[in-house]
A protein has these predicted regions:
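Short, conserved micro-motifs composed of acidic
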Residues: 28-343
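C-terminal or otherwise distal, non-catalytic regulatory regions appended to signaling enzyme catalytic cores
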Residues: 8, 27-28
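Sec-dependent signal peptide recognition
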Residues: 7-14
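Short, linear, compositionally biased motifs with a strong N-terminal bias
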Residues: 15-19
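N-terminal secretory signal peptides that target proteins for export/translocation
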Residues: 1-7
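C-terminal motif of bacterial Sec signal peptides marking the signal peptidase cleavage site
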Residues: 21-23
Length: 343
């Protein structure tokens, strides 16, 4: 996980959490209440070939936001917020009921401030929620970054359970991403070298097999982390650092997989996705395959004008202020890159 190497990046601790819901419809509950938000993807206008800030004032705020996941039916959204220079980080949740989205709140199993909860991922069939937490696996274990999973039964998420060996180890595991056949891709911290590498473990008869470290076309750059794999395993998006054609510190790269399990040379995903900003290390694709969501701390706001308490607070509490936000773009950007994949 990038925070293991990049947590020295300074993010401001917000003094005020302002979730001022931006209206996506003209209906309101009443004077002083939050606007009713309805429609797919929180009623946001779909992006084309240019990236857009996602859900300004609802999900993307002045805080640090990252790690977007949505269920296949489009009715549940998970994402992360952090504060206090990563002292506190947890998973937020919004659900659409009777056509109306709830205001994002902390997910019910991610409320203990003693632990971190991050990097949610929904399985392609929508029955499992994977995420990372520093919760101890049991009373005899020490707190450590492990992969946890909740199972959905009768419309309710179960309490999380530790995924266990062989995927989880005494070291640290990050950023789970699962294919249709249950294969899990994730980042593992090598306790000897101190480097992070992308691994995968196949699911056979309901049991995860011995993890496999992927080759150099996936484990690229001087550092890499937080890889997202397509549900059909046809491509993988890898945030990589130290690449010669990088726009900034860490950029999103993509590698495509052929029928013989070969991975193509990694390709920078271009200015449509990457920027000179350093905070770009969490990407995912919606379960309908239409949209790429990604984290970026690019600045999008102009000067706050004449500096005052009011203007600085407004700037501080607004998205695109230098803290990471969530953006989205059509996956046509991926298909264009696929055409020129080199193995």
């Amino acid at each position: 996980m990038i925070y293991n190497k990049m947590k020295k990046l300074s993010y401001s601790l917000l003094l005020v959490l302002a979730v001022s819901i931006t209206s996506c419809t003209s209906n309101r509950r009443g004077s002083g209440d939050a606007a009713v938000v309805s429609g797919d993807y929180l009623g946001q206008a779909a992006p084309g070939d240019s990236a857009r800030l996602f859900a300004s004032g609802i999900i993307s705020t002045g805080m640090t936001e990252r790690d977007f996941a949505i269920t296949p039916d489009g009715n549940e959204i998970f994402f992360c917020r952090e504060a206090g220079n990563f002292r506190y980080v947890t998973i937020f949740y919004s659900r659409r009921s009777d056509g109306v989205w709830s205001i994002p709140e902390v997910f019910e199993f991610c409320t203990d401030p003693a632990y971190k909860y991050v990097e949610p991922h929904i399985s392609p069939d929508g029955t499992r929620l994977y995420f990372i937490s520093t919760m101890p696996a049991d009373s005899a274990s020490e707190a450590n970054e492990d992969i946890w999973v909740c199972t959905k039964t009768d419309g309710r998420w179960s309490e999380p359970r530790n995924l266990g060996a062989p995927v989880n180890t005494a070291s640290k595991e990050f950023f789970p991403s699962v294919t249709v056949d249950g294969t899990i891709y994730y980042t593992h911290l090598d306790p000897v070298s101190g480097e992070e590498f992308i691994y995968r473990s196949k699911l056979v008869n309901g049991v995860f097999q011995e993890p496999e470290k992927l080759g150099p076309n996936v484990n690229t750059g001087s550092a890499r982390y937080n890889a997202f794999v397509a549900d059909d395993e046809s491509y993988i998006i890898v945030p990589a650092y130290g690449m010669p054609d990088s726009f900034g510190a860490t950029d999103y790269y993509i590698s495509f997989r052929d029928s013989l399990d070969n991975w193509s040379q990694p390709v920078n995903m271009g200015p449509e996705v990457n920027s000179a900003s350093p905070g770009e290390w969490s990407a995912s694709v919606s379960t309908d395959g239409k949209y790429l969501f990604f984290m970026s701390d690019r600045m999008g706001r102009g000067s706050p004008g004449r500096l005052s308490t009011k203007t600085l607070q407004e700037f501080h509490n607004s998205p695109q202020n230098g803290n990471p936000d969530i953006y989205w773009i059509s996956t046509t950007v991926i298909e264009k890159l696929r055409e020129n994949a080199t193995f």
